[in-house]
Amino acid sequence: MAGKRDYYEILGVEKGADQDTIKKAYRKLAMQFHPDKNPGNKEAEEKFKEAAGAYEVLSDAQKRAQYDRFGHDAFTRGGGGGGFTDAEDIFSHFGDIFGDFFGGGMGGQQRQRRNRNEPRRGSDLRYVTEITLKDVITGIEKEIEFDTDKNCDECKGTGAEKGSQVSTCGTCGGSGQVVRQQGFFAMASTCPTCHGQGTVIKNPCKPCKGKGRVAEHRKIRLNIPAGVDTGTRLRVATEGEGGYMGGPPGDLYVEIRVKQHNNFERRNEDLFAELSLPYVQMLLGAEIEVPTVTGKAKLEVPKGTHHGDNVKLVGEGLPSLRGNRRGDIYFTVNVQFPEKLHKDEEKLLREIAKARGLNVTSEGGFFGKKK
């Protein structure tokens, strides 16, 4: 059995595509391969189901995060997601999307937009915050601020002034859509009277101007655990957009970005840095003090270290997000020569060269001429 195609490839979008781009790409494929437009075409039906399976995962923030990390394996061990058996299953799952194109008539089932007075969950929100490499080691509590919407307290989300009524739109009959027939297909568009809401407000609520929603500025404290990396997403339940008409709020997803450090390069839990050492310490070995992200530590340089060798400082890297280990720091050693030799140093080196049978320049050569 051939492996499953990449979901982003199926929809024809980049991996970093936003939800609007993903939704538009899926709509385009749904129109192209819809069974009503391709009666009896099994290949079109399979492509239709394939696109629906991809959209089911990529349109859900949690499922998409799992897929981005583990691929199809995220859903092969009871994880759920990405599977439809027939067209009716797809229609029931994505009725609101298809309704925009087919006037609610999908597979012989009449569908309507949600009533604005029906309780609905608020949307999920995305927030990006930046932390330092030191924060990755220690963890940090940060205060974040963002703007969102919630139900208007005055009208409780109805959009109507107290004591006035919300009536069903006479133009669309409450569906939020007007339908026109074009040959075999019934094509729908947003109702121009109620703008897709299905209801008409005669006396709008003044605080929210009839929208039923008001802006809200929110501050929350967020605990960022040690070991996170750029791209890590933290879910804060119920801190997203407020629900509609008493519905539950959405969630807040905070994406982490780690600032680049001046001295250290990160590779998973390990850190890498450059270290210049005098040739004598490299030859004879030494215990030296080196910088770390949070301070300083002692590093044992082995005897006979070569230029370009990596010397490891154990346990001074970054913690694992799961908390079961800590990485190391690798110092790439560069040989450091003195600008000028003292006479006794030069004498000793010449004696070493003579003992090893090495040909060197005469006295007053390279080091002797440098000022």
Swiss-Prot record:
GO-annotated molecular function: ATP binding; heat shock protein binding; unfolded protein binding; zinc ion binding
UniProt xrefs under InterPro entries: DnaJ, DnaJ_C, DnaJ_domain, DnaJ_domain_CS, HSP40/DnaJ_pept-bd, HSP_DnaJ_Cys-rich_dom, HSP_DnaJ_Cys-rich_dom_sf, J_dom_sf
Record carries keyword Ion transport: no
Gene3D superfamilies, alphabetized: DnaJ domain, Heat shock protein DnaJ, cysteine-rich domain, Urease metallochaperone UreE, N-terminal domain
Domain J: 6-71
Co-factor requirement: Zn(2+)
Cytoplasm found in the keyword field: yes
CXXCXGXG motif-type repeats, residues: 152-159, 169-176, 191-198, 205-212
Example of a GO cellular component annotation carried by this entry: cytoplasm
Intracellular or extracellular location(s): Cytoplasm
Function summary: Participates actively in the response to hyperosmotic and heat shock by preventing the aggregation of stress-denatured proteins and by disaggregating proteins, also in an autonomous, DnaK-independent fashion. Unfolded proteins bind initially to DnaJ; upon interaction with the DnaJ-bound protein, DnaK hydrolyzes its bound ATP, resulting in the formation of a stable complex. GrpE releases ADP from DnaK; ATP binding to DnaK triggers the release of the substrate protein, thus completing the reaction cycle.
Family membership: Belongs to the DnaJ family.
Description of its domains: The J domain is necessary and sufficient to stimulate DnaK ATPase activity. Zinc center 1 plays an important role in the autonomous, DnaK-independent chaperone activity of DnaJ. Zinc center 2 is essential for interaction with DnaK and for DnaJ activity.
Protein name (Swiss-Prot/TrEMBL): Chaperone protein DnaJ
UniProt source species: Bdellovibrio bacteriovorus (strain ATCC 15356 / DSM 50701 / NCIMB 9529 / HD100)
Gene for this chain: dnaJ
